[in-house]
Amino acid sequence: RILEACTLYVLFRDMVSLQRQNFVQNLDCFLLAHLAEDLSIERLTKEFHISKNKLYESCNKYMQNGIAEHIRGLRLAEAKRLLKETTLSVHEISDRVGFNDYNYFCRIFKKYFGTSAGKYRKEQSNYHSNFLAK
């Protein structure tokens, strides 16, 4: 009986781990594909066929922060990538990653990364120039 209980525990634990992995992967895949769009709670609940409570509960359970913070983090990470890898203007990048308010994007970027988006791009450009020159 103890062996049976241990086996069931391991199976259950693995199932929960798989559920978490699937939820986070599916959510992130959808969010990354639609960063520039409105990612309201209503839209996400319709897309994933779950209630608001279940969405909040799942995000709190499987992620380190809430859904709004998670989306913001994905948007900012994509903005950093675009600043590094493209010549799009900061304004274009803010639109492309779903920040409808350019000034808000600039404030939140600086708050998260300690530097402005323009300075970040310049620093990355200087780093790559120095790296290639060596």
Language model features by range: what are they?
Residues N53, Y102-N103, G118:
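Key DNA-contact positions within bacterial/archaeal DNA-binding proteins
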Residues R43-K52, Y56:
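Helix-turn-helix
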Residues E47-F48, V97-G98, F109:
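Core residues of bacterial helix-turn-helix
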Residues L55-C59, Y104-F105, F109:
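Short hydrophobic/aromatic patch on the recognition helix
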Residues C29, A33, D38, E42, ...:
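Terminal helix-turn-helix DNA-binding modules in bacterial transcription factors
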Residues L55, G66-I67, I71, S116-A117:
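Short amphipathic alpha-helical segment with a characteristic S/N-K-E followed by hydrophobic residues
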Residues R1-Q19, K54-Y56:
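An amphipathic alpha-helical interaction segment
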Residues S17-V24, I41:
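Short, structured helix-loop boundary elements
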